[in-house]
């Protein structure tokens, strides 16, 4: 069997901004492998990297998500949206799989703004966007919140989290006596953006060799180096099983308790949740696309055929969908 060439993996220091935004180079690769590896790693980065996210909220005096709170400027839906955006640094030694953790807040200070930094956290936990505004109060002691978080992967909508809350409600502890547990969407993906490029190396070899460069931007909850390492381990775990021709058995790659269902949970997600530009949103709306599930059924060519969608809008929609673990069929890579 022909030996493979020695591959080098390095960080591109010239493009490094910090631990959470940097670029990596893999070279030399045989012709075609740069795109093959880049596509696989990119998709795993966007869909399967572990992180921590809220899944349930309890607010003092709030029985459902459509209420208003006395002496609080924001209504409950606005507060829930902001709580969902709390970003917590992921450390598997602190946030164990299958366990539930609580963030608590009590506005015992005078009237004013309340931020993510005002939450009491589990020991060792850190909020990476402490300046996130949660609410503005007109008096002291009017807002008390418990936010329940867990480790996971991908995207879980509030309907699935409702079912999960019903299953584990007896394990949720809260000092808030009057109020209901409210489910929120969980976006576990710690990746903000990932892209790759492939190019031929200028060598004297008669064999064409390629360079793969991957640019990764995370949300600050995990550093880029650990993210790409985790993606590679996931791919290797799958490929090792496929390569074991003597044991053609079905095996679970991910440990029990950290596994989210692979099928997409997009039936209840409206396109408003994609946070698209007005031009892209209106084009989809005029074409009668209202949910992410409808877009999931499209190919990239179908998307290109929608009236008033230019290349920039198409790229925006594709990028937003991938954050929900939805990948449009692009044909042959």
From Swiss-Prot:
Please provide, in alphabetical order, the Gene Ontology terms of the cellular component aspect for this entry: cytoplasm; DNA-directed RNA polymerase complex
Q: Quote the SMART domains the UniProt record gives.
A: RPOLD (SM00662)
Q: Where is this region: Alpha C-terminal domain (alpha-CTD)?
A: 263-333
List the GO molecular function terms. Answer: DNA binding; DNA-directed RNA polymerase activity; protein dimerization activity
Q: Where is this region: Alpha N-terminal domain (alpha-NTD)?
A: 1-246
The GO annotation for biological process reads: DNA-templated transcription
Stored Pfam families: RNA_pol_A_bac (PF01000), RNA_pol_A_CTD (PF03118), RNA_pol_L (PF01193)
Q: Which domain of life is it from?
A: Bacteria
Q: Which InterPro entries match?
A: DNA-dir_RNA_pol_insert, DNA-dir_RNA_pol_RpoA/D/Rpb3, DNA-dir_RpoA, RBP11-like, RNAP_asu_C, RNApol_insert_sf
For this protein, what reaction is catalysed? RNA(n) + a ribonucleoside 5'-triphosphate = RNA(n+1) + diphosphate
Top enzyme class, one word, equals transferase
Q: Does the keyword Transferase apply?
A: yes
Q: Which UniProt keywords apply?
A: DNA-directed RNA polymerase, Nucleotidyltransferase, Transcription, Transferase
EC number of the protein: 2.7.7.6
Q: How does it assemble?
A: Homodimer. The RNAP catalytic core consists of 2 alpha, 1 beta, 1 beta' and 1 omega subunit. When a sigma factor is associated with the core the holoenzyme is formed, which can initiate transcription.
Q: What is known of its domains?
A: The N-terminal domain is essential for RNAP assembly and basal transcription, whereas the C-terminal domain is involved in interaction with transcriptional regulators and with upstream promoter elements.
Q: What is this protein called?
A: DNA-directed RNA polymerase subunit alpha
Output the lineage of the source organism: Bacteria, Bacillati, Mycoplasmatota, Mycoplasmoidales, Metamycoplasmataceae
């Amino acid at each position: 069997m022909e030996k493979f060439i020695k591959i080098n993996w390095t960080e591109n220091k010239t493009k490094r901004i910090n631990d959470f935004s940097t670029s990596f180079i893999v070279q030399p690769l045989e012709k075609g492998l740069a795109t093959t590896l880049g596509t696989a790693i990119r998709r795993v980065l966007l869909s399967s990297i572990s992180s921590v996210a809220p899944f349930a909220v309890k607010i003092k005096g709030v029985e459902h998500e459509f209420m208003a709170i006395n002496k609080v400027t924001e209504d409950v839906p606005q507060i829930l949206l902001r709580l969902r955006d709390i970003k917590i640094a992921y450390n598997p030694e602190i946030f164990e799989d299958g366990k539930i953790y609580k963030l608590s807040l009590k506005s015992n200070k005078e009237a004013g703004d309340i931020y993510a930094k005002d939450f009491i956290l589990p020991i060792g936990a850190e909020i990476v966007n402490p300046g996130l505004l949660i609410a503005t109060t007109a008096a002291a002691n009017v807002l008390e919140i418990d936010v329940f978080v867990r480790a996971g992967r991908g995207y879980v909508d509030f309907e699935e989290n409702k079912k999960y809350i019903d299953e584990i409600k007896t394990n949720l502890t809260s000092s808030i006596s009057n109020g209901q547990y409210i489910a929120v969407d969980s976006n576990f993906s710690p990746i903000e953006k990932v892209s790759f490029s492939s190019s031929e190396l200028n060598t004297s070899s008669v064999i064409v060799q390629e360079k793969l460069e991957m640019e990764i931007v995370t949300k600050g909850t995990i550093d880029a180096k650990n993210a790409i390492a985790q993606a590679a381990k996931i791919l290797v775990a799958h490929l090792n099983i496929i390569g074991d021709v003597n044991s053609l058995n079905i095996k679970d790659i991910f440990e029990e308790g950290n596994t989210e269902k692979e099928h997409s949970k997009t039936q209840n997600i409206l396109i408003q949740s994609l946070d698209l530009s007005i031009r892209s949103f209106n084009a989809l709306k005029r074409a009668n696309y209202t949910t992410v599930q409808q877009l999931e059924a499209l190919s990239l060519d179908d998307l290109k055929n929608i009236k008033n969608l230019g290349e920039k809008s198409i790229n925006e929609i594709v990028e937003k969908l991938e954050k929900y673990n939805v990948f449009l069929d692009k044909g042959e890579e």
